[in-house]
Amino acid sequence: MKKLSKRMAALSTKIEDRIYAPLEALSIIKENANAKFDETIEAHIRLGIDPKYTDQQLRTTVALPHGTGQSIKIAVITSGENVSKAKAAGADLFGEEDLVESINKGNMEFDLLIATPDMMPKVAKLGRVLGPRGLMPNPKAGTVTNDIANAIKEFKAGKLEFRADKAGIVHVRFGKASFTKEALFDNLKTLQESIDKNKPSGAKGKYWKTFYVTSTMGPSVQVDINAVQDYQPEG
């Protein structure tokens, strides 16, 4: 077992072995995020699904109300006049077969790849490169579309794609330590609603197993999922 650093061990002693109310958990995470940079706040959620079955896979997008606090690099593979549209909309990389070839040679200087449907036969050839990194465009994720400009705008504004990994765990970065706990909760609530809304048809038994939040350099805190689901804004 990996030995905890003195810093991590000290922070961990402040956390009780119990399930916390959402805002209390987020307060603790913010308090412990004391590195010399603005730490990213993450959610790690274990779901009662087995993604090896197609009807138990989860892959979708969510538009967080307060964004993620991170800037992302977007690449767009398209054709014709859409190339100039992608450039005008703020894409960091854009092109046709030239970009396909560049990516195939190892150019992975982007966080998200968007493609128009007409280019997908060529993009499909990049499966070996894109697949392991989770970067293959997908209609369900909103990354295969003819509305290039709007897709770029939404993802730059904080829309993000997430999926359950092979173990049925969802890993999502949903803010920064500099966010207020209320803003972090708004994002977390929106994420929870998206996961419930997109529950796989083949999911059986208990859907939500465990729900943890953490920061880049801090320990994790378990959150009461029922309290998140049952929250109703005042007024």
Swiss-Prot record:
Gene3D superfamilies named among the record's database cross-references: 3.30.190.20, 3.40.50.790
GO molecular function: rRNA binding; structural constituent of ribosome; tRNA binding
SUPFAM superfamilies, A to Z: Ribosomal protein L1
GO biological process per UniProt: regulation of translation; translation
Keyword tags: Repressor, Ribonucleoprotein, Ribosomal protein, RNA-binding, rRNA-binding, Translation regulation, tRNA-binding
Annotated InterPro entries: Ribosom_uL1_bac-type, Ribosomal_uL1, Ribosomal_uL1-like, Ribosomal_uL1/biogenesis, Ribosomal_uL1_3-a/b-sand, Ribosomal_uL1_CS
Record GO cellular component, one term: large ribosomal subunit
Protein family per UniProt: Belongs to the universal ribosomal protein uL1 family.
Subunit architecture: Part of the 50S ribosomal subunit.
Function: Binds directly to 23S rRNA. The L1 stalk is quite mobile in the ribosome, and is involved in E site tRNA release.
Matching NCBIfam families: rplA_bact
Name of the protein this chain belongs to: Large ribosomal subunit protein uL1
Organism of this sequence: Prochlorococcus marinus (strain MIT 9301)
